[in-house]
Each structure stands twice: as C-alpha cells, then as structure tokens.
C-alpha cells in the first residue's frame, strides 16, 4: 500500500475540512496510509511537496486548497503559479493529485469540496494513486 502526503492550504478552513474528508475517505477505502501537513496558502503547496519528496518517505501526494476570485489580480497569480509549481513537480516524476480548487465564489467551492456532491478531494486522491500506478507500470518508483 502507498504512503501518501496530503498538503493542504488552510486559508478557507471550512472548505478544506470538506476536501480533506474526501481525500481521507478515498485513501482509507483503498487501505493507503497518509499524513497531512498544513501550509499558509496555495502558493506554498508546491514547495512543501518538493521538500517532502526529498525525504523519500512518501509514494504520492495530494495538493489541497481553495482559491476564490476576488477583486484583484491575486486570483490569477495564485491559481496559475500554484498549478505551474505542481505541474513542474509531476514532470519531475512525482505522483500528485491536484485538489486545489480555483472558483468564482464560495457556492462553487462548496459544491466541489462536498464529498456527497462533486468530491474533488476524493478525485484528487484517486488521481494521485492513478499516477502512482502508472509510475509502477513503467517500472519507476
């Protein structure tokens, strides 16, 4: 079984609790172990994954957070740069499921975070496991 690190940006804690519930449920259902670390915001998620990868303790990673559009350009910066950082790590061979929601409003975030609705947390966990399986299929790991 895999050992998975969940990296969560807690800026919107009530929404992240929902995402985290979905991730943990998906991993527990498959019998995988997991740990969770918290970072201040979505921009810090890729750095935390990179640091954890250097430890060699984890097989896969799940990135969690919520970015809600506001009145400034900050939304674009955080959304684009966090996604770019995660993509760079995946291209370096890490198995990562990206569960950082980028939405227009809290209603959209609630629909996506709730595991009884869109369950984007659970989907991110399954994506990480799928990428780990692909690595194993290619004999990488």
Swiss-Prot record:
GO terms for molecular function: 6,7-dimethyl-8-ribityllumazine synthase activity. It comes from the Bacteria. The keyword Transferase applies. It catalyses: (2S)-2-hydroxy-3-oxobutyl phosphate + 5-amino-6-(D-ribitylamino)uracil = 6,7-dimethyl-8-(1-D-ribityl)lumazine + phosphate + 2 H2O + H(+). It holds the Pfam family DMRL_synthase. Keywords: Riboflavin biosynthesis, Transferase. InterPro entries: LS, LS/RS, LS/RS_sf. GO terms for cellular component: cytosol; riboflavin synthase complex. GO terms for biological process: riboflavin biosynthetic process. SUPFAM superfamilies: Lumazine synthase. It is an enzyme of class 2 (transferase). The active site is at 74 (proton donor). Pathway: Cofactor biosynthesis; riboflavin biosynthesis; riboflavin from 2-hydroxy-3-oxobutyl phosphate and 5-amino-6-(D-ribitylamino)uracil: step 1/2. Its EC number is 2.5.1.78. 5-amino-6-(D-ribitylamino)uracil binds at residues 11, 42-44, 66-68, 98. (2S)-2-hydroxy-3-oxobutyl phosphate binds at residues 71-72, 112. Catalyzes the formation of 6,7-dimethyl-8-ribityllumazine by condensation of 5-amino-6-(D-ribitylamino)uracil with 3,4-dihydroxy-2-butanone 4-phosphate. This is the penultimate step in the biosynthesis of riboflavin. Belongs to the DMRL synthase family. This is 6,7-dimethyl-8-ribityllumazine synthase. It comes from Sphingopyxis alaskensis (strain DSM 13593 / LMG 18877 / RB2256) (Sphingomonas alaskensis). The gene is ribH.
């Amino acid at each position: 079984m895999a050992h998975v690190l969940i990296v969560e940006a807690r800026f919107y804690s009530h929404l992240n609790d929902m995402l985290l519930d979905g991730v943990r449920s998906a991993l527990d259902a498959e019998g995988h172990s997991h740990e969770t670390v918290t970072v201040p915001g979505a921009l810090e998620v890729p750095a935390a994954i990179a640091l954890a990868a250097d430890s060699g303790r984890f097989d896969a990673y799940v990135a969690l957070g919520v970015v809600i559009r506001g009145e400034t350009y900050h939304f674009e910066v955080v959304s684009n740069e966090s996604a770019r950082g995660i993509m760079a790590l995946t291209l370096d061979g890490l198995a990562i499921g990206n569960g950082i929601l980028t939405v227009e409003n809290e209603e959209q975030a609630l629909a996506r975070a709730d595991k009884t609705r869109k369950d984007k947390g659970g989907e991110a966990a399954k994506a990480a496991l799928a990428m780990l399986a692909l690595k194993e299929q290619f004999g990488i790991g």
